[in-house]
């Protein structure tokens, strides 16, 4: 319930703070709420309250976060008139955006769904662990690089010459950080898996090919990230929706063909082939 209320009442404020370079407001609030709610939940469980009351406490703490964000926006954006008639023309590509989102949903979940349907749970477990580790690395990169995205968006819509210079610097910085972290991941991941899986015999977690495939997949994904941002800044969703659909189709088709022959390697190769197409065509 808190997620639905958050989306409907706080979503617009979150976007406003993001494009104004104040994402740290929502990030700090979310961090405090997360820690506070966990402490309260632990306290309630230790004192014998049932699960309904524990979840209700989480709901109440999240409501306090929404109230705080709303008050912050009203105080620092007093000029903002929420009673103005919405400009629906600005949302003329909403259907195209939905196509992108659905296509992205299919693309991002093809691997795990195909493995769940056509492989055993041990294979899914190995894939999920590798994916979790690489996702943590991706979160670090995003945390370091996403804080300046709003500057790029503002420059794109106000000063194209300045944007081109800024984009070149940002792309170099972004790719450099990405390659550094994924290179370290490629080197350290096998050793981590040997330590993690010590004593585990039901599944083979140590694999010489999986680190390379996972890192290759993510390097390709991050190599196109800066170009994809330009599409978002320019609002060219309709012009690129077919390419997004083709990318998902390639991933799904190749994964379904290869999963029966080489298992987990097959779905990863399918994703890599789709990324090769989209990275060159973006």
Q: Where are each of the predicted segments found?
A:
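Helix-terminus/linker motif at the lipid-water interface of multi-pass membrane proteins
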Residues: 43-48, 105-136, 151-155, 190-202
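Interfacial segments at transmembrane-helix termini and the short loops linking adjacent helices
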Residues: 1, 188-219, 225, 265
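Small-residue-rich midsections of specific transmembrane alpha-helices
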Residues: 3-11, 65, 101-110, 128-151, ...
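Helix-loop junctions and terminal segments of transmembrane helices
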Residues: 18-19, 134-171, 227-233
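Hydrophobic alpha-helical transmembrane segments
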Residues: 27-75, 89-93, 100, 131-134, ...
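Interfacial/gating helices of multi-pass transporter permease domains
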Residues: 51-52, 89-93, 97, 115-135, ...
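Interhelical loop/hinge segments that connect adjacent transmembrane helices in multipass membrane
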Residues: 51-58, 67-109, 113, 151-165, ...
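Membrane-interface junctions at transmembrane-helix termini in multi-pass inner-membrane proteins
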Residues: 3-28, 52, 216-246, 282
